[in-house]
């Protein structure tokens, strides 16, 4: 089954799907993939903050030095750069394990919206079995986001570009990342629900964009709006350190992680229901 909708109809559908997903916030089983990802993000955060601990210093101290310079090794400087350090660590965690969380969530949401819920473990096993496909299918977009978010701004800064140029580059990178996110969210349904491989997934994307692209844009924008205020909290790290409570920055980054997971929950559920409604069987509940 495939249903064609114009742009306005897709916007209305996106709103309906986001509301339907919000009504699922209290279902613990749907949170399991994100809780696992959150634990991994938390471990990365604690390892960065506690890089000097004997258990991890052999690996983490050189890593912190490479990413933030030798000054970060002196207390409490690491907390000044902790949000930026964790953003880089989170990128790696998301690239390797976040794709499994997305895949599992897609499978769980699809079953829930079809009125045939499955255990969280089944969703995780299903996604883990397709880990390689999910990883490779998402990898080109992950690399583009890496270049836009970190590579270009750092290259301009190394060249001594003006503040205006840097801000414009960051703004352009933000817009580019949003466009990439629109394509990004379409991959998991093709892999997990349509059962496509990497090559077929990328072949199918151009034909999928006209069918659900407007809805995907709306969902990506809302998720970005939800996530944006929390990501701006990183700017307060210096102020927190200067006021003599550097360890509170760990809590600040933890808030960023939690909000990002909520945004990911909303995105995965909404795009899954959009896909079911326009491409696959929407199920009894919808």
Language model segments and positions:
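Short, hydrophobic/aromatic alpha-helical segments in well-folded domains
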Residues: 20-21, 122-123, 187, 204
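Loop-to-transmembrane-helix entry motif
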Residues: 24-32, 127-134, 138, 208-216
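Hydrophobic alpha-helical segments embedded in or immediately adjacent to the lipid bilayer
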Residues: 131-164, 172-187, 226-230
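Short cytoplasmic-facing helical segments at TM-TM junctions of multi-pass membrane proteins
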Residues: 197-209
């Amino acid at each position: 089954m495939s249903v064609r909708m114009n742009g306005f109809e897709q916007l209305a559908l996106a709103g309906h799907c986001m509301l339907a997903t919000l009504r699922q916030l209290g279902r613990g089983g749907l949170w399991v993939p994100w809780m696992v990802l959150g634990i991994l993000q938390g471990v990365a955060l604690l390892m960065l903050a506690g890089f000097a601990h004997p258990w991890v210093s052999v690996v983490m101290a050189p890593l912190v030095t490479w990413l933030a310079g030798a000054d970060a090794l002196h207390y409490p400087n690491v907390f000044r750069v902790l949000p930026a350090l964790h953003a880089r660590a989170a990128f790696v965690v998301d690239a390797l394990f976040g794709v499994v969380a997305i895949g599992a969530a897609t499978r769980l949401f699809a079953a829930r919206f079809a009125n045939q819920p499955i255990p969280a473990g089944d969703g995780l096993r299903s996604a883990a079995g397709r880990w390689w496909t999910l990883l490779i299918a998402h990898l080109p977009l992950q690399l583009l986001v890496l270049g836009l978010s970190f590579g270009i701004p750092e290259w301009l800064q190394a060249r001594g570009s003006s503040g205006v140029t840097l801000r414009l580059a960051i703004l352009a990178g933000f817009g580019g990342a949003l466009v990439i996110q629109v394509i990004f969210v379409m991959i998991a349904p093709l892999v997990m629900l349509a059962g496509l491989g990497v090559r077929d997934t990328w072949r199918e994307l151009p034909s999928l964009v006209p069918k659900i692209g407007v809805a995907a844009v709306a969902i990506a924008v809302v998720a970005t709006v939800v996530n944006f205020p929390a990501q701006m909290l990183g700017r307060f790290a210096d102020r927190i350190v200067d006021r003599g409570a550097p360890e509170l920055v760990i809590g600040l980054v933890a808030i960023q992680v939690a909000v990002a997971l909520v945004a990911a929950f909303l995105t995965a559920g909404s795009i899954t229901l959009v896909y079911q409604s326009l491409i696959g069987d929407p199920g009894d509940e919808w």
